[in-house]
């Protein structure tokens, strides 16, 4: 992925996205029938597992992740060809953050000469690593519990029943009958991506004028896209202001 310096995310910022992620695309390469490499892609929910020492690095306030980058854990149908064929080289998980269309009509620059075009803003993290397939039912079950718990808690947080009673109902793997769970476990395999490299990109208008970023924020808020608006207010607007001030300083020195 092409990442200009002003759009690049640090490893710590990438990990922050992984800890909140829902799902992402597992991308692998396999030998086709004629030996030609063929990509394969499956969209999966993932659980981020920090590497050893990551918590200590976070407490120290470091900008990078210490003690290893950790891993992503997920599950695939046992009959999925993606896990039945040998993988060539490393695998990648593509994580999609927020994204949205940017219309010129929302930007003050549109009314100040019209030198503006539409674009698409987005946040993404490409997670590279070595993929391991796990066939042990105990490993698969142990990896399902935290994944299910996290997403159940996230889902329950928006449940009107919880807002009314103070506690929304949630589901746990152990709620299901054991024979049913055993049958389900036989139908899947576990996949673990041991992370070797993170590439993060936030193309979120940091290179625009502060006025244009403010226009985008207003447009997002008007459409109820509050999380995207908050990101641009907290990250993009300060970056745009720093860029504006730097360019103004350089002009003054000429």
Task: Show which residues each predicted segment covers.
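Hydrophobic, proline/glycine-rich low-complexity stretches
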Residues: 1-22
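Catalytic micro-motifs at enzyme active sites that drive phosphoryl/nucleotidyl and oxygen chemistry
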Residues: 13, 28-35, 82-83, 113-116, ...
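A short, structural micro-pattern
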Residues: 20, 40, 68, 87-88, ...
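Short beta-strand segments
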Residues: 21-78, 93, 104
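Short loop/turn segments at secondary-structure transitions that flank enzyme active sites
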Residues: 32, 50-52, 80, 99-101, ...
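Short, structured beta-strand-loop surface elements
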Residues: 65, 77-143
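Beta-strand secondary-structure signal
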Residues: 73, 92, 128, 190-194
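C-terminal edge-of-domain segments
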Residues: 132-254
């Amino acid at each position: 992925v092409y990442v200009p310096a002003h759009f690049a995310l640090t490893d710590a910022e990438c990990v922050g996205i992984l800890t909140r992620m829902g799902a992402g695309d597992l991308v692998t390469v396999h030998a086709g029938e004629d030996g030609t490499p063929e990509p394969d892609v499956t969209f999966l929910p993932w659980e981020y597992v920090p590497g050893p020492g990551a918590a200590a690095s976070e407490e120290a306030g470091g900008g990078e992740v210490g003690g290893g980058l950790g891993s992503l854990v997920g599950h695939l149908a046992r009959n999925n060809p993606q896990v039945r064929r040998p993988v060539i080289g490393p695998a990648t998980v593509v994580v999609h953050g927020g994204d949205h269309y940017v219309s010129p009509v929302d930007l003050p620059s549109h009314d100040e000469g019209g030198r503006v075009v539409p674009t698409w803003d987005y946040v993404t993290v490409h997670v590279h690593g070595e993929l391991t397939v796990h066939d042990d039912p105990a490993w698969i079950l142990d990896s399902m519990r935290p994944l299910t718990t996290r997403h159940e808690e996230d889902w329950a947080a928006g449940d009107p029943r919880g807002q009314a009673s103070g506690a929304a109902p949630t589901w746990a793997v152990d709620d299901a009958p054991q024979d049913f769970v055993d049958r389900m476990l036989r139908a899947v395999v576990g996949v673990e991506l041991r992370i070797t490299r993170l590439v993060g990109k936030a193309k979120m208008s940091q290179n625009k004028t502060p006025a244009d970023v403010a226009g985008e924020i207003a447009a997002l808020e008007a459409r109820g896209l509050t999380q995207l608006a908050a990101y641009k207010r907290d990250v993009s607007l300060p970056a745009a202001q720093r860029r504006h001030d730097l360019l103004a300083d350089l002009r003054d020195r000429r």
